[in-house]
């Protein structure tokens, strides 16, 4: 059953062009979450992942900039209010020459913020466990299985 749910989520993500958005960088977190096994930021983003942060709905561009990210990589009420209100992500600062990047997640597929708020640091070596939970969305006929990312 769990494999079927994860396979369906993976296909849904592929249908959304790999869960990519104009502001999102594919760092590999969506694929790692859909695999269903615990992972760390450093395993996914590489050994040069120095710091990581959660980005939750209603992230403020100035808040992201204060953490070291490009404010243009963050949704706002002015450029995409629906994503600003609903999408979550994980942002990574690298110790090498790579640009800081945020991978954003469609809320019907992955929720990076159960119990977290924007700017909460993520230990790059701490296990993140993807757990599938049913979520009720307005207008849907029934619950949707969403992958929740839980830091241990």
Question: Where are the predicted features?
Answer:
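Bacterial N-terminal signal peptides that target proteins for export
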Residues: 1-7
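C-terminal motif of bacterial Sec signal peptides marking the signal peptidase cleavage site
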Residues: 15-18
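Bacterial signal peptide processing site
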Residues: 20-23
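Secreted/processed peptides and extracellular or luminal domains of membrane proteins
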Residues: 25, 62, 119-120
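Post-signal peptide N-terminal segment of mature Sec-exported envelope proteins
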Residues: 27-45
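Mature extracytoplasmic domains of secretory-pathway proteins
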Residues: 45-113
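C-terminal partner/receptor-binding element of secreted or periplasmic proteins
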Residues: 111-152
């Amino acid at each position: 059953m769990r494999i079927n749910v994860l396979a369906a989520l993976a296909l849904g993500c592929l249908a959304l062009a790999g869960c990519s958005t104009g502001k999102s960088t594919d760092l590999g977190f969506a694929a790692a979450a859909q695999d269903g096994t615990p992972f760390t930021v450093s395993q996914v983003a590489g050994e040069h992942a120095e710091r990581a942060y959660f980005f939750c709905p209603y992230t403020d561009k100035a808040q992201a900039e204060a953490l070291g990210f490009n404010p243009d990589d963050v949704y706002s009420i002015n450029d995409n209010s629906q994503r600003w209100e609903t999408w979550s992500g994980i942002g990574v600062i690298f110790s090498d020459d790579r640009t800081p990047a945020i991978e954003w997640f469609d809320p019907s597929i992955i929720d990076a913020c159960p119990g977290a708020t924007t700017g909460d640091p993520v230990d790059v070596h701490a296990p993140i466990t993807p757990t599938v939970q049913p979520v009720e969305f307005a207008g849907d006929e029934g619950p949707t299985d969403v992958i929740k990312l839980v830091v241990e």
